[in-house]
Amino acid sequence: MPQLDTSTWFITIVSMLLSLFILMQLKFIKFSSFSTPCPTTMEKTKHLTPWEMKWTKTYLPHSLPLP
């Protein structure tokens, strides 16, 4: 029974890793990133909702005072 020839495995694995590294670098180079991130000021928008105009309280039946 012949043995498996593993003499070329090292160069195959190294070349595969190198090519994957190069491909990933080429993929990442397409992404644009900001060089200096600056904060943006967000303006608050006021939404008019009916429950903000008056104070309401919800009474549950079990919280009513006893007679």
Swiss-Prot record:
Membrane topology: Single-pass membrane protein
Keywords in alphabetical order: Acetylation, ATP synthesis, CF(0), Hydrogen ion transport, Ion transport, Membrane, Mitochondrion, Transmembrane, Transmembrane helix, Transport
Chain positions with N6-acetyllysine modification: 54, 57
Molecular function terms from GO: proton transmembrane transporter activity
GO CC, alphabetical: mitochondrial membrane; proton-transporting ATP synthase complex
Subcellular location: Mitochondrion membrane
Annotated Pfam families: ATP-synt_8
In-chain residues carrying the UniProt-annotated modification N6-succinyllysine: 54
Primary residence: mitochondrion
GO BP term, pick one: proton motive force-driven ATP synthesis
TM region positions: 8-24
Annotated PANTHER family: ATP SYNTHASE PROTEIN 8 (PTHR13722:SF0)
Family the UniProt entry places it in: Belongs to the ATPase protein 8 family.
Record function comment: Subunit 8, of the mitochondrial membrane ATP synthase complex (F(1)F(0) ATP synthase or Complex V) that produces ATP from ADP in the presence of a proton gradient across the membrane which is generated by electron transport complexes of the respiratory chain. ATP synthase complex consist of a soluble F(1) head domain - the catalytic core - and a membrane F(1) domain - the membrane proton channel. These two domains are linked by a central stalk rotating inside the F(1) region and a stationary peripheral stalk.
Subunit (UniProt): Component of the ATP synthase complex composed at least of ATP5F1A/subunit alpha, ATP5F1B/subunit beta, ATP5MC1/subunit c (homooctomer), MT-ATP6/subunit a, MT-ATP8/subunit 8, ATP5ME/subunit e, ATP5MF/subunit f, ATP5MG/subunit g, ATP5MK/subunit k, ATP5MJ/subunit j, ATP5F1C/subunit gamma, ATP5F1D/subunit delta, ATP5F1E/subunit epsilon, ATP5PF/subunit F6, ATP5PB/subunit b, ATP5PD/subunit d, ATP5PO/subunit OSCP.
Record protein name field: ATP synthase F(0) complex subunit 8
Organism field: Dasypus novemcinctus (Nine-banded armadillo)
